[in-house]
Amino acid sequence: MIHWEQSRTLLSFPQVGLHLSWYGIFFSLGIFLSSFAGIRLATVLCKDPNMRKELKTGLENFALGALLVIVIGARAFYVLFYGGSFYFENPSEIIKIWKGGLSSHGAIIALVIWSAAFSRFHIRRLPMLSVTYICDICGAVFGVAALLIRVGNFMNQEILGTPTSMPWGVVFANDSSLIARHPVQLYEGVSYLLLSLVLYWLCYRGSIRLGSGYSAAGALIGVASIRFCAEFFKTHQGSWLGEESLLTIGQWLSIPMVFLGIGILWIASKKREP
């Protein structure tokens, strides 16, 4: 059994009212490292040396916009699906993301939309920047960000797991029940990282071609499946569905992602047919 009493705040500057949380640091670091890995993967695999610099610049611009878009999408989904009536009664609280409340499903949807928009405005200059190309890169490198974000959740003592008698059960100081719980944040984060590493390796060695859609489809199906299973080890979240509901909000939101991934796989397979 592990007793976890880590403060949610990494650095505090009360003189200026600034408090840096573990979650915020890990979130930012994760996005940066995943972006770096994605740009590196794309430039290494680019066969035209004259295009590498321009491709690198384009993907750097994509990554900068993605950071903002991910936060907006993740917050919007949290407010809609997990906030219940609270945010409708207190709309000024919606912008206070430093208090917590981001949804990974919203982040994924926002990233796909941003990929489509970015591709539309840049594909004439860089024809390789198709929606599937960008999404394939994201699918191959998302794991670092996903892991660090879940580590941030663990450090913040949020998204608690169900009770367990296993020796690695964690007693969180902020949990009033003070009972050992599954460190489900780490289960989920490590699973995402392993999935992403497999996809990255397949892309790097050429088994999956960037732009084919296979990496994006694999990531969507894999992430949704991992999330669906992880929900069984989480305490109840959200207020739209009661604890007696057959599935959680997270599981319901994961189901369309599986079908979307299957649809992309089907389209990709049709393109390969002679």
Swiss-Prot record:
Entry keyword Zinc: no
Transmembrane segments: 16-36, 62-82, 94-114, 129-149, 184-204, 213-233, 247-267
Pathway the protein contributes to: Protein modification; lipoprotein biosynthesis (diacylglyceryl transfer)
EC number assigned by the record: 2.5.1.145
Keywords for this protein: Cell inner membrane, Cell membrane, Membrane, Transferase, Transmembrane, Transmembrane helix
Native source organism of the sequence: Chlamydia muridarum (strain MoPn / Nigg)
Cross-referenced PROSITE patterns: LGT (PS01311)
Record-level GO BP terms: lipoprotein biosynthetic process
Protein name: Phosphatidylglycerol--prolipoprotein diacylglyceryl transferase
GO MF annotation: an example: phosphatidylglycerol-prolipoprotein diacylglyceryl transferase activity
GO CC terms of this entry: plasma membrane
Domain of life per record: Bacteria
InterPro entries tied to this protein: Lgt
Topology in membrane: Multi-pass membrane protein
